[in-house]
């Protein structure tokens, strides 16, 4: 023991015995030999598993990986083996290609059975440096923890840089924070007691301690744990802080009082004392109690005071300090609180308050300016408001219009155009409808005779009354107007609708548009209604007696009826053309016709419908009149040598004076006034009567005729003054008859012109040009005869003036 003490003493003194030196040298040699063996030894690695810091999930595993790597690099193999057994090292499945192992890492687990006692695991480190990550790790943590361990608690507490802004809610176990917290509470109580009674001053903001509050910390000893030696200093500092706070309060109050003296008046409190309030409420008081001009003046004064605020407030504060020192000599002003110029420095808290007041005053000025601008701005009228609203609505309306136009364009583009097959089908439908109309008109014409026979007397009486009323200048009644028109058996409304739909279908077909199915269905329904009405009319007429001879003779725009050989009555249609001479001639002609007529089969002339204009006047011309069917089935057949001779036979017949055939049908006409010498034949333009059976016609000396033989054996007589056109056959085409009709139409034009020239008192509607008549003739030529469009049923296509009459619902 004594030797050991000696060696220790020698070690402290730096001196060692010879034995000790020899023993130490022997130990070093043995350790060097071990190190050489370890350095020369080559460990065996198991490359199936590797240690990698990339697979570390915690900081502890990361540290273990670098410790193991450090042991391998320094050849501490035995320590590394033991470390693998005890530490949780992050492992990675090994691979021959190290890059692949790093890119696609997979975690692995190590068991003691898998690892040979003489084997080690290789390392694959991502964070590897010359000094190794382990050294940097320990240097970082040592620098952190050494600072904490070496420094005292008081020094750490003094480094609280935010101590003036952060206040603890509950006192801590340390004595220093509790003293500071209690002192701050006492300061707040004193500030509340020294206030002038305004509760709003307590909400000006949290109290900020002066820099002098930190004196007790700097005066304390950093080596001592408790500040016992600074009790007296703290009391002195508290007194100084209280005096400073009082001075700052008085300074703020004086600055506000100076503003009150410059003209700003605030309302008083309950005790009658005036007190200062926050400038935010000043704006409301000023705006409520003063006019705009007074407010502007007050704001100008405030602006001047604020521009001189720094120097003015410093001077006022210095004066306040002097007054306090004179009033209370026991509390002199120390030199530390006054700068070299003799002015008291403004605290940061008061300066912030002053700046906030300035900002509020500027906001108040801006509000006043905005109010003045609004008052000076002229208010818009109602018209201007409406115009602005309309302008605002214009873009919306334009957008809606554009949307509608776009929709229409899209719908037009998407609308399917009719194909050629559809157009062909439409044309076939039109042809079928025309054929059905022709067949219906023929069937109705064959059965219309008995009905016209019964209605003849009543119609003739009504027409006579209407014509008498027109001649006397009296207005016609609605019943008389209806009697003048030939209503027929078919409803005119259905015909009008049918024809209007036909026109629409034709326009659609011309424009290559598709015909809707609804229109086609309506057409078929109207066709069925027409057929039903015609069948009902036929059923009503069956069983009634039918006469063998039915004549309709329109003589110079007059209707003559001779039922059973009785006396005839002639009534004129127009005032200008009805003269006494014409009446006398008509009576003589009618008497001669009655004498020459067949006794066994008396002729009955059925009245025709007289076209009237929209104002109720009767149209004088015979254009557009509708003739009923003339039935001459029982008349004897004519015998003539000129049958089939054509034009040559016609010329020869004109030279003959007396016909050899007996007279079965007599028709006569009287020439118009002023044209008795050279009279021209008059025909109904565009209207021909269909003949059933055969007929013979003959004329007296005053009415020379031209008899023409038809292909079917019937005869046609062309009268110079009047051409009834009985030779038209509805079942077959006849070229000769067509030529004769064209010639008669030309003659009719001339006759109408002569009538217009000879009758100066005629109406303007009676004056018709040749072009208009030719146009009407062209429009009336449908099929073989006028009956193909149902003209015999009271269905007029065109009126005198060339415009549609009954089609469009005149």
Swiss-Prot record:
Domain LisH: residue ranges: 59-91
Residue ranges with Low complexity bias: 219-248, 321-338, 441-484, 678-698, 729-763
Cellular location(s): Cytoplasm; Nucleus
Ranges annotated as spanning the membrane: none
Keywords: Activator, Cytoplasm, Nucleus, Transcription, Transcription regulation
InterPro entries per UniProt: LisH
GO annotation terms (biological process): regulation of biosynthetic process
UniProt feature, compositional bias: Basic and acidic residues: 1-13, 584-598
Top-level taxonomic group: Eukaryota
Composition-biased stretches (Polar residues): 173-218, 564-581, 599-640, 666-677, 704-720
Bias (Basic residues) ranges: 651-660
Keyword Transferase: no
Annotated spans, Disordered: 1-25, 173-249, 263-296, 321-347, 364-428, 441-489, 560-771
SMART domains: LisH
GO terms under cellular component: cytoplasm; nucleus
Function of the protein: Transcription factor that regulates pseudohyphal differentiation, invasive growth, floculation, adhesion and starch metabolism in response to nutrient availability.
UniProt record similarity statement: Belongs to the MSS11 family.
Protein's name in the database: Transcription activator MSS11
Organism: Vanderwaltozyma polyspora (strain ATCC 22028 / DSM 70294 / BCRC 21397 / CBS 2163 / NBRC 10782 / NRRL Y-8283 / UCD 57-17) (Kluyveromyces polysporus)
Taxon lineage: Eukaryota, Fungi, Dikarya, Ascomycota, Saccharomycotina
């Amino acid at each position: 023991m004594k030797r050991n003490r000696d060696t220790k003493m020698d070690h402290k003194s730096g001196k060692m015995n010879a034995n000790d030196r020899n023993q130490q040298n022997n130990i070093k040699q043995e350790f060097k030999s071990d190190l050489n063996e370890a350095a020369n030894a080559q460990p065996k690695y198991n490359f199936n598993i590797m240690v990698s810091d990339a697979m570390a999930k915690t900081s502890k595993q990361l540290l273990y990986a670098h410790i193991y790597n450090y042991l391998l690099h320094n050849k501490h193999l035995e320590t590394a083996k033991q470390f693998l057994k005890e530490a949780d090292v992050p492992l990675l499945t090994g691979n021959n290609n190290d890059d692949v192992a790093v890119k696609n890492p997979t975690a692995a687990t190590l068991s003691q059975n898998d690892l040979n006692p003489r084997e080690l695991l290789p390392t694959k480190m991502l964070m590897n440096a010359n000094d190794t990550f382990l050294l940097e790790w320990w240097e970082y943590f040592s620098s952190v923890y050494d600072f904490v361990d070496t420094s005292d608690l008081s020094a750490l507490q003094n480094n609280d840089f935010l101590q003036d802004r952060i206040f603890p809610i509950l006192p801590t176990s340390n004595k220093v924070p509790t003293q500071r917290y209690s002192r701050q509470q006492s300061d707040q109580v004193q500030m509340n007691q020294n206030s002038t009674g305004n509760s709003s001053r307590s909400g000006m903001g949290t109290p900020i301690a002066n820099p002098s509050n930190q004196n007790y910390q700097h005066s304390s000893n950093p080596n001592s744990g408790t500040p016992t030696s600074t009790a007296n200093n703290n009391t002195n500092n508290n007194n100084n802080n209280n005096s400073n706070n009082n001075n700052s309060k008085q300074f703020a109050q004086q600055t506000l009082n100076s503003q009150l003296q410059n003209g700003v008046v605030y309302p008083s409190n309950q005790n009658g004392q005036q007190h200062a309030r926050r400038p935010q409420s000043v704006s409301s008081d000023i705006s409520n109690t003063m006019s705009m001009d007074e407010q502007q003046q007050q704001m100008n004064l405030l602006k001047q005071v604020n521009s001189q605020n720094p120097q003015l407030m410093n001077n006022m504060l210095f004066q306040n300090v002097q007054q306090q020192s004179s009033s209370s000599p026991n509390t002199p002003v120390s030199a530390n609180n006054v700068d070299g110029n003799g002015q008291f420095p403004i605290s940061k808290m008061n300066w912030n308050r002053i700046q906030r007041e300035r900002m509020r005053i500027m906001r108040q000025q801006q509000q006043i300016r905005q109010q003045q601008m609004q008052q000076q701005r002229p208010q818009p009228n109602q018209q201007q408001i409406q115009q602005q609203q309309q302008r605002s609505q214009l873009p919306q309306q334009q957008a809606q219009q554009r949307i509608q136009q776009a929709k229409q364009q899209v719908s037009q583009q998407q609308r399917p155009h009719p194909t050629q097959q559809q157009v062909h089908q439409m044309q076939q439908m039109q042809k079928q409808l025309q054929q059905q109309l022709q067949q219906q008109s023929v069937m109705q014409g064959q059965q219309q005779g008995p009905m016209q026979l019964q209605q003849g007397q009543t119609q003739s009486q009504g027409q006579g009354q209407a014509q008498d009323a027109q001649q006397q200048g009296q207005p016609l009644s609605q019943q008389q107007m209806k009697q003048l028109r030939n209503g027929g058996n078919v409803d005119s409304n259905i015909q009008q609708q049918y024809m209007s739909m036909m026109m629409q279908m034709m326009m659609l077909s011309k424009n290559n548009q598709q015909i809707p199915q609804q229109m086609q269905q309506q057409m078929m329904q109207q066709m069925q209604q027409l057929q039903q009405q015609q069948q009902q009319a036929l059923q009503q007429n069956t069983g009634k007696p039918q006469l063998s001879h039915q004549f309709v003779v329109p003589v110079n725009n007059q209707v003559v009826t001779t039922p059973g050989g009785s006396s005839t009555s002639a009534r004129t249609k127009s005032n200008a053309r009805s003269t006494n001479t014409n009446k006398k001639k008509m009576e003589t002609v009618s008497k001669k016709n009655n004498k020459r007529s067949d006794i066994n089969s008396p002729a009955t002339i059925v009245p025709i419908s007289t076209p009237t204009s929209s104002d109720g006047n009767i149209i004088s011309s015979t254009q557009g009149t509708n003739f009923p069917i003339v039935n001459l089935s029982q008349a004897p057949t004519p015998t003539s040598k000129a049958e089939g001779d054509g034009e040559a036979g016609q010329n020869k017949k004109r030279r003959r004076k007396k016909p050899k055939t007996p007279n079965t049908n007599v028709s006569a006409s009287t020439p118009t006034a002023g044209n008795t010498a050279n009279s021209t034949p008059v025909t109904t333009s565009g209207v021909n009567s269909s003949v059933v059976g055969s007929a013979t016609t003959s004329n007296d000396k005053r009415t020379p005729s031209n008899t023409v033989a038809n292909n079917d054996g019937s005869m046609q007589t062309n009268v110079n003054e009047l051409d009834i056109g009985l030779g038209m056959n509805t079942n077959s085409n006849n070229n000769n008859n067509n030529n004769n009709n064209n010639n008669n139409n030309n003659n009719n034009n001339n006759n109408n012109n002569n009538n217009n020239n000879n009758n100066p008192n005629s109406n303007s509607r009676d004056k018709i040009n040749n072009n208009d008549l030719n146009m009407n003739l062209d429009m009336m030529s449908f099929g073989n005869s006028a009956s193909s469009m149902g003209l015999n049923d009271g269905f007029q296509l065109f009126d005198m003036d060339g415009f549609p009459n009954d089609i469009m619902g005149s």
